[in-house]
Amino acid sequence: MMRHLLSAGDLTRDDALLILDTAAELARLADRPIKKLPTLRGRTIVNLFYEDSTRTRTSFEAAAKRLSADVINFSAKGSSVSKGESLKDTALTLEAMGTDAVVIRHWASGAPHRLAGWVRGSVINAGDGTHEHPTQALLDAYTIRRHLGGVDGRRVAIVGDILHSRVARSNVTLLHTLGAEVTLVAPPTLLPVGVESWPCAVSYELDGVLPKCDAVMLLRVQRERMQAAFFPTSREYSRRYGLDAARLALLPEHAIVLHPGPMNRGVEIAAEVADSPRSVVVEQVANGVVVRMAVLYLLLGGGEPALAGRAAEPAAAAIGGGW
């Protein structure tokens, strides 16, 4: 059984399907008046965030609390980190407090791997630099599966700033593991060196890719990570790579539009597309909670059935142990 979730590459197909199946069972809680389960009562989970976050931090907090865990939110701002404390010393402090799991977001690629060597509890990567964001990939796969009936054989286009995107890296890996055909669409300046070795296709033209897509994922341009000009203007970028109403019409009728957020409306996605029935952006946020509940549950080895009563019976095998 794995102790950590550091990379989408850590997951076998069976691992990923177990998480998605467990999340589907836990999603039944959303329709209940009381959404909490006692499965992680007495466990302590720390959200250790060195970068700003709205969706991911609050999603992990909601997931942990719905499993009855005690949650400590740690922000680098206002902590001893601002006084020069190293990641290792912070880790040793958390270890001394008896933390069961640490959810870490860090500006440095590889920080979660380092942390995993310093603590006895589980470590979950909530985004490290431009490297990976495995739970985002899991919730995206979960969303695709809910709408399209499965991931295997589906054609997914990921469009935008691939160079700086940890979401793109994790999605390419996980979607390939689950049998999807992935195409990256971006200007050459926003593609990383070595992308030809990734398990996906690459295109510089969006219009030719859209008619063959089952799902299209838009990525924002991460200007905060850019030290130079990667394209002439935002208007020119939007003209070539933005998803507007005209391009939305090129998609098959069943295709869905995803975005990990935050969105830059009018740049990579037009407002009318973001708010259209084809957009599942808000649903991705809701799905993120149940997927992260599943990850926490399986990593921390919950021994009780996740759902009480007859509704839990089909899930007994999937939710009984961990992976």
Swiss-Prot record:
Identify the pathway.
Pyrimidine metabolism; UMP biosynthesis via de novo pathway; (S)-dihydroorotate from bicarbonate: step 2/3
Task: Output the GO biological process annotations, alphabetical, semicolon-separated.
Answer: 'de novo' pyrimidine nucleobase biosynthetic process; 'de novo' UMP biosynthetic process; amino acid metabolic process
Alphabetized Pfam families for the sequence: OTCace, OTCace_N
Q: What is its EC number?
A: 2.1.3.2
Residues that hold L-aspartate according to the record: 83, 166, 220
Q: Where is the signal peptide?
A: none
Its keywords, alphabetically, are: Pyrimidine biosynthesis, Transferase
Provide the binding site for carbamoyl phosphate.
55-56, 105, 133, 136, 261-262
Query: GO cellular-component terms in the record?
Result: cytosol
Please give the Gene Ontology molecular function terms for this protein.
amino acid binding; aspartate carbamoyltransferase activity
Enzyme class label: transferase
Reaction(s) this enzyme catalyzes, per UniProt: carbamoyl phosphate + L-aspartate = N-carbamoyl-L-aspartate + phosphate + H(+)
Q: Which superkingdom does the taxonomy of this entry point to?
A: Bacteria
| Record InterPro entries | Asp/Orn_carbamoyltranf_P-bd, Asp/Orn_carbamoylTrfase, Asp/Orn_carbamoylTrfase_sf, Asp_carbamoyltransf, Asp_carbamoyltransf_Asp/Orn-bd
Role noted for this protein: Catalyzes the condensation of carbamoyl phosphate and aspartate to form carbamoyl aspartate and inorganic phosphate, the committed step in the de novo pyrimidine nucleotide biosynthesis pathway.
This protein's assembly is summarised as: Heterododecamer (2C3:3R2) of six catalytic PyrB chains organized as two trimers (C3), and six regulatory PyrI chains organized as three dimers (R2).
Read off the PANTHER family from this record. Answer: ASPARTATE CARBAMOYLTRANSFERASE, ORNITHINE CARBAMOYLTRANSFERASE, MITOCHONDRIAL
Annotated family: Belongs to the aspartate/ornithine carbamoyltransferase superfamily. ATCase family.
* Name of the protein described by the UniProt record: Aspartate carbamoyltransferase catalytic subunit
Naturally occurring in which organism (per UniProt): Acidothermus cellulolyticus (strain ATCC 43068 / DSM 8971 / 11B)
